[in-house]
Amino acid sequence: MHYSPLTVLALLGGTLLLYCSGLVIYRLVFDPLSKFPGPKLSAATFWYEFYYDVIKKGQFTFKIGEWHKQYGPIIRINPYEIHIDDPEGDFYHTVFSGTGVRDKHFWYASQFGTPESGLGTINHHLHRHRRRALNPSFSKASIVRLTPVIWSKIEKLCSRFDELRGTDQPVNVRLAYTCLTTDVITSYAFNRCWNHLDKPDFSPVWCKTLVNGSKMTRWTKQFPWMLETMKKMPQALVGFFDPGMLLVFDVMNKIHHQILDILNGKQEVEDSATDGLSKSPIPNRTIFHELLKSDLPDYDKTIHHLGQEGQNIIGAGADTTSNALTVITYHLLSNPRVLGKLKEELERAMPDRYGAWDLKVAEGLPYLGGVIQEGLRLAYGASSRLTRVAPEEDLNFDGWFIQKGTPISMTALYMHHNEKIFPNSHTFLPERWTDAPDGGRSLDRYLVSFSKGSRQCIGINLAKVELFLTLATVFRRFEMDLHDTVFERDVQLKHDFFLPQPSMQSNGVRVIFK
């Protein structure tokens, strides 16, 4: 029997239409998630999220907030997933449990393009095994041993700020802080500092690269194959479609080659004059040397696995802490009362303006601690929702039965602006921590910038040491004024690219050193 091309196309089109219709009917009527409230269009198709995240540039997170106001604290946000905004805040610790088995959802984890890394690992037990190998490098004791390296980078940052005193030259502090955190994490990861603090302009291209990598998650969540496909394409073609991804791939290659040098036993950079790298004073205690000495199987010590781990360590280690430093700097400089109170505490603790801070002294300052906690709350960590799956237990929330295996997400943005837990939540108020009867310990339960549970951000100790030492040093030594910086444009979360971004029109939080 002979069929014309038009007949074949009609049959294929009809089959596709029947499949899509059946899929939509199943999702809306027969799927176990069909009982949960929420918009039907979003429950039927992922294209709704695609529209708000890709076309509207990172707006789906805000749409979720609107839906919660309309439908209540538990909603279905796509065909696979429910989202919870708990008015009491306590269910977060059930979803992000430290004792229960918690997988990641494959669809959500795929956005990172690093399935062999700790961040991208789906299975709970495999994640624990991989995490155990990294834990020693990020323990508090290990980070304390790293403080000479951290301190050397802070001193270099301050020397750059010293050069700018009295020049009336505005500085984008997000760039400067990103140079600081990058030089710290690259020294620790590879024993090779990338020396961004030496760049006269504070490496705006590097900061742009981090943003481009963050933006890419909007696409890779929807199309997991996209990143690997782009890697195999000619660079000219990649540049035609997305010039920013060339910067991301350059960094991936740089990380790949530096890890290869570690695998091949090379401790020093052979030609630092050509690649801008320098050896750091921690030759045998880098993160990747420790991974190679761990009990991970040989497969997890290959360049394929370690390269993915390196991408996540550098990206997370550089961007999230610099954002917190930037948010805190803005709120201090825009609030003379809070700034004055902090400076008084710093001056009492360190009479010598140019003295070197002891970590224990800095960590023991209550108001500085409150400033940091409040800054972390308003910087959010990840602006996007985080998703967990309880594969072995059914859960219950507010009378709703949640079948085991259901992807459940929650978002730091909504936890941190829960007015019941944090009254006047949009106000920068360190006293909510320092004046609490228990010193703010009860509020710590609801501060989820690093998430919670067995998959909590592994870099929490490093981030906090960087925050304490950097803020204590910079605000003890320098007098600054904001320059052409507007909260709504330059600080407020406007785009969720997994990590928070301000308005596209922002020139950054800029300051002038007096």
UniProtKB/Swiss-Prot annotation:
<keyword id="KW-1133">Transmembrane helix</keyword>
<keyword id="KW-0408">Iron</keyword>
<comment type="function">
    <text>Cytochrome P450 monooxygenase that hydroxylates polyporic acid produced by the nonribosomal peptide synthetase acyN to produce the less toxic metabolite ascocorynin. The hydrophobic substrate polyporic acid might approach the active site from the membrane and, after hydroxylation into ascocorynin, leaves into the cytoplasm. MO6277 appears vital to avoid high-level accumulation of polyporic acid in the fungal membrane.</text>
</comment>
<dbReference type="InterPro" id="IPR002401">
    <property type="entry name" value="Cyt_P450_E_grp-I"/>
</dbReference>
<dbReference type="GO" id="GO:0005506">
    <property type="term" value="F:iron ion binding"/>
</dbReference>
<dbReference type="InterPro" id="IPR017972">
    <property type="entry name" value="Cyt_P450_CS"/>
</dbReference>
<dbReference type="GO" id="GO:0016020">
    <property type="term" value="C:membrane"/>
</dbReference>
<keyword id="KW-0479">Metal-binding</keyword>
<comment type="pathway">
    <text>Secondary metabolite biosynthesis.</text>
</comment>
<keyword id="KW-0472">Membrane</keyword>
<keyword id="KW-0349">Heme</keyword>
<dbReference type="GO" id="GO:0016705">
    <property type="term" value="F:oxidoreductase activity, acting on paired donors, with incorporation or reduction of molecular oxygen"/>
</dbReference>
<dbReference type="InterPro" id="IPR036396">
    <property type="entry name" value="Cyt_P450_sf"/>
</dbReference>
<feature type="transmembrane region" description="Helical">
    <location>
        <begin position="6"/>
        <end position="26"/>
    </location>
</feature>
<dbReference type="Pfam" id="PF00067">
    <property type="entry name" value="p450"/>
</dbReference>
<comment type="similarity">
    <text>Belongs to the cytochrome P450 family.</text>
</comment>
<dbReference type="GO" id="GO:0004497">
    <property type="term" value="F:monooxygenase activity"/>
</dbReference>
<protein>
    <recommendedName>
        <fullName>Cytochrome P450 monooxygenase MO6277</fullName>
        <ecNumber>1.14.14.-</ecNumber>
    </recommendedName>
</protein>
<dbReference type="InterPro" id="IPR001128">
    <property type="entry name" value="Cyt_P450"/>
</dbReference>
<keyword id="KW-0503">Monooxygenase</keyword>
<feature type="binding site" description="axial binding residue">
    <location>
        <position position="457"/>
    </location>
    <ligand>
        <name>heme</name>
    </ligand>
</feature>
<dbReference type="GO" id="GO:0020037">
    <property type="term" value="F:heme binding"/>
</dbReference>
<dbReference type="InterPro" id="IPR050121">
    <property type="entry name" value="Cytochrome_P450_monoxygenase"/>
</dbReference>
<keyword id="KW-0812">Transmembrane</keyword>
<keyword id="KW-0560">Oxidoreductase</keyword>
